[in-house]
């Protein structure tokens, strides 16, 4: 069953929101410019609202996709795709 949203965590020093935008542009569609709101960064990749929160949990950055319209069934599938493309440590 498809999840209503997806959230994964990427290891701190290994990736930034610009690398994430490049990956999401390929997977979901073109990313809008990132807008910083406090500690968070927001953009839209295709039709999917995206939130990037650096150091959300210790050394882990949160990537939150607010939609069920992604190519991934669940957090684990998204985490595997992120690992394959970005070559970074990922948790869900």
Outline where the language-model segments fall.
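Short, extreme N-terminal segment that most often corresponds to the first beta-strand
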Residues: 1-25, 30
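Short, surface-exposed beta-edge/turn micro-motifs
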Residues: 4-7, 60, 87-88
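A common structural junction motif
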Residues: 25-32, 85-90
């Amino acid at each position: 069953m498809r999840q209503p949203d997806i959230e994964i965590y990427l290891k701190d020093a290994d990736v930034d929101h610009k690398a994430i935008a490049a990956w999401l542009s390929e997977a979901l569609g073109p990313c809008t410019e990132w807008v910083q709101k406090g500690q968070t960064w927001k953009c839209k990749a295709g039709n999917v609202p995206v939130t990037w929160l650096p150091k959300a949990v210790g050394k882990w950055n949160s990537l939150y996709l607010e939609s069920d319209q992604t190519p991934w069934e669940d957090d684990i599938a998204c985490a595997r795709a992120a690992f394959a493309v970005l070559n970074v440590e990922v948790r869900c």
